[in-house]
Amino acid sequence: GFLSAEEKGLVNGLWSKVNVDEVGGEALGRLLVVYPWTQRFFQSFGDLSSADAIMSNAKVKAHGKKVLNSFSDGLKNIDDLKGAFAKLSELHCDKLHVDPENFRLLGNVLVCVLAHHFGHEFNPQVQAAFQKVVAGVASALAHRYH
């Protein structure tokens, strides 16, 4: 696997304390605020006219929750991310034509949100392990492009 046993321990230890539903909504919301061009995939979501509108948008929260629950499931199959995300890769790449760069952006936003929520606990070692994970997930989701 691409993570050492120690790194897996750090990731799982922190992840067990994450409120997946809440963090998912915040991460997706921040993605849409910070990288506004990603909003074009969410035109059916209603009001995305301001940061406040986006962060309180129920559809954004619901999809963010869905996204992070999938990420959570993926963590259980950390040594086979390609397999874990094959169906989602197909959906996002072949059907929705999402630029794989967006998966990387969301991963980086997720790292920011975790740092914000966990403060000192999200130390450099934990961040390094999570950066590997989000890069691995982004790469698995982009798999259909290669």
Curated annotation (Swiss-Prot):
One Pfam family named in its UniProt record: Globin
Q: Give the GO molecular function terms.
A: haptoglobin binding; heme binding; hemoglobin alpha binding; metal ion binding; organic acid binding; oxygen binding; oxygen carrier activity; peroxidase activity
Q: Which residues carry this modification: N6-succinyllysine?
A: K17, K59
The Globin domain extends over: 2-146
Residue positions, PTM Phosphoserine: S44, S50
Matching entries from InterPro entries are given as: Globin, Globin-like_sf, Globin/Proto, Hemoglobin_b, Hemoglobin_oxygen_transport
Positions bearing Asymmetric dimethylarginine = R104
Swiss-Prot/TrEMBL keywords: Heme, Iron, Metal-binding, Methylation, Oxygen transport, Phosphoprotein, Transport
Q: Which Gene3D superfamilies match?
A: Globins
Expression across tissues is:
Red blood cells.
Q: Does the keyword Zinc-finger apply?
A: no
Output a single Gene Ontology CC term carried by this record.
Answer: hemoglobin complex
Miscellaneous comment in the UniProt entry for this protein: In the cat family (felidae), the oxygen affinity of hemoglobin depends little or not at all on the association with diphosphoglycerate (DPG).
Q: Which family does it belong to?
A: Belongs to the globin family.
Q: What does this protein do?
A: Involved in oxygen transport from the lung to the various peripheral tissues.
Could you describe the subunit structure of this protein? Answer: Heterotetramer of two alpha chains and two beta chains.
Q: What is this protein called?
A: Hemoglobin subunit beta-2
**Top-level taxonomy:** Eukaryota, Metazoa, Chordata, Craniata, Vertebrata
